Amino acid sequence: MMPRYCLAIVVMVAGVGCNQFESGKIVEVTGRVTLEGRPVEGVVVQLEPDQSSVGPGKKVLPTAYGKTDADGRFRAFRTGKNKFGAAVGLNHVRVTVPEGSSAKVHPRYMGDSTFWHEIGPGPTVVDLELVADPTAVRRQASESAAD
């Protein structure tokens, strides 16, 4: 019969590495969302890690969310857990407006936005300075470049 302490050691060793993203790949992320320089209250910032570097058999890195307060500030926390932080590396950034919120955000910042942010190896600040019509800003930049 196998001694019980051997079974406990096997279970502990089997659990090592199960939370690979816990050790060094998750960092504190805070930030602020402004629209035309004014804080945006009640929107949700989503930070979805680029999964292209996750190989077969590796854990998918968790998506993080943060809801803005009256000053537009947020603190990211992970999906399915009551733990703060976001995955280190390139993250797809989306801003969504929950039902019932009075915040006005251009659809360009939501859904399949093209906005990415690199989360560094230490605590990271993600400040999002939104404009009312990002398509107008892009047109202006294109026209200036053509001159």
Can you name each region flagged by the protein language model?
Residues 1-16:
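Sec-dependent bacterial lipoprotein signal peptides
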Residues 18-147:
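Beta-strand-dominated extracellular/periplasmic modules and repeats
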